[in-house]
A protein has these predicted regions:
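Beta-rich carbohydrate-recognition and catalytic domains
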Residues: 1-21, 25, 29-85, 93-147, ...
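C-terminal structured domain segments
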Residues: 268-270
Length: 300
C-alpha cells in the first residue's frame, strides 16, 4: 500500500480570528464523484479550537479549493462542559437526510494535562451543526475510568452502528497518557454499548494508537490509524479484521514516498477517500497539523 505525498492542500486562514493556526484531524465527507468537504479543527490565538471546513474539487488528477468556511460550523461548548475549551471533528455520517458529526471535546485538566471526550452534533445543510446532547456520548465506567474516550469513527452494519474510538489505559504522569483503540455498538447513535474490547493494542514500545478510520469492503474491516513510539512522532498504521473486534496489525503494508519536510517527523490522524477510481489519504504532518492538511495518493 504505497502512497505518494502530494503535500499540503489547505492551510489555516489566518485572516479569520478562529483559524489562526492548525487544521487538525481532517475529516472527509464525499459530496459527489468530484467534490469532497473536509472538516477540520483550527485554533485561535488563545489556542482554543473550533471546527470549520474546506471544499475540494477533484479533476484531471488535481484538487482545487472551491470554498472554505469563514466561520465555524461548531464552536466550543458551555463553560464547565466537557468541550468548553475546544472541539475537533472525527467522523461525519448521514442518517435519514441528517448529517451527524462525531467530534472531540477538549478541556484542560489539573492533575492531568487534559480530557478528550466524544460528542455528537447534527445538521441538515453542513454549514452549521447543533449539539444532539450537551453531554458526552461515551461514558466513564469501571473498565474505562480515564477522561480520554474520543476520536470515534462510525459505520453502519447489520442494522446497527459500530464505533471504534480512542480509550485511555493509564496516565504515566501528568503529561503522558497511554491509549489504544476500543469498540462500541449502538442502535441510535446516542446511547453506546462500550464493550471494553481493545481492537488495536499497544505494542511494548508504543505509547499511543489514535484516530481510527474504518471501512468495510470485500467481507472484512479495514482500519487506518496512527501510532506513536516517540512523543510527537506519529506514523500511520493499518489493520484488518473479520468481525470488527479482533484485529491484525499490518503496519508494514503502509509506505509513503515523495516526503515533504513538514511531514518528516509526523504523519497523524488519517482519513481515506476514493474518488473517480483513485484513492487518497488525508492527514496531518509535523506538530499535529500546524501547517495544514496533507494529502497522499495511493499508487496502483
Amino acid at each position: 500500500m504505497k502512497f505518494k505525498s502530494i503535500g499540503i492542500i489547505f492551510k489555516p486562514k489566518k485572516k479569520f480570528s478562529w483559524s489562526f493556526t492548525h487544521c487538525m484531524v481532517p475529516t472527509v465527507l464525499k459530496i459527489n464523484n468530484n467534490k469532497i468537504r473536509i472538516f477540520f479543527g483550527s485554533r485561535n490565538k488563545s489556542n482554543v479550537s473550533s471546527i470549520g471546513y474546506v471544499d475540494l474539487y477533484y479533476e484531471n488528477n488535481k484538487f482545487k479549493v472551491i470554498k472554505y468556511s469563514n466561520k465555524p460550523v461548531l464552536k466550543p461548548g458551555l463553560l464547565g462542559s466537557f468541550d468548553d475549551n475546544g472541539v475537533l471533528p472525527s467522523c461525519v455520517i448521514k442518517k435519514n437526510k441528517i448529517f451527524y458529526l462525531f467530534y472531540i471535546g477538549w478541556r484542560p485538566g489539573v492533575t492531568t494535562r487534559y480530557s478528550l471526550i466524544a460528542g455528537l452534533a447534527k445538521s441538515k445543510n453542513l454549514d452549521s451543526f447543533k449539539r444532539v446532547t450537551k453531554s458526552p456520548i461515551l461514558k466513564l465506567n469501571d473498565s474505562e475510568p480515564y477522561q480520554i474516550l474520543t476520536a470515534p469513527t462510525v459505520i453502519k452494519k447489520d442494522n446497527k452502528y459500530y464505533m471504534w474510538y480512542v480509550s485511555c489505559n493509564k496516565w504515566q504522569n501528568k503529561d503522558l497518557p497511554y491509549y489504544d483503540i476500543k469498540f462500541a455498538t449502538s442502535k441510535n447513535l446516542i446511547k453506546w454499548d462500550q464493550t471494553g474490547i481493545s481492537c488495536i493494542k499497544l505494542k511494548k514500545d508504543e505509547r499511543a494508537v489514535a484516530r481510527p478510520f474504518v471501512i468495510y469492503e470485500k467481507n472484512f474491516f479495514k482500519m487506518w490509524y496512527c501510532f506513536e513510539k516517540k512523543r510527537g512522532k506519529y506514523k500511520i498504521g493499518y489493520g484488518e479484521s473479520l468481525d470488527g473486534k479482533k484485529w491484525i496489525r499490518k503496519d508494514d503494508k503502509i509506505e509513503f514516498i515523495n516526503n515533504f519536510k513538514s511531514e518528516n517527523k509526523m504523519r497523524a490522524y488519517p482519513n481515506l477517500i476514493r474518488l473517480k477510481g483513485d484513492t487518497f489519504i488525508f492527514y496531518n504532518g509535523n506538530n499535529y497539523g500546524e501547517e495544514g492538511i496533507f494529502c497522499a495518493k495511493l499508487l496502483n
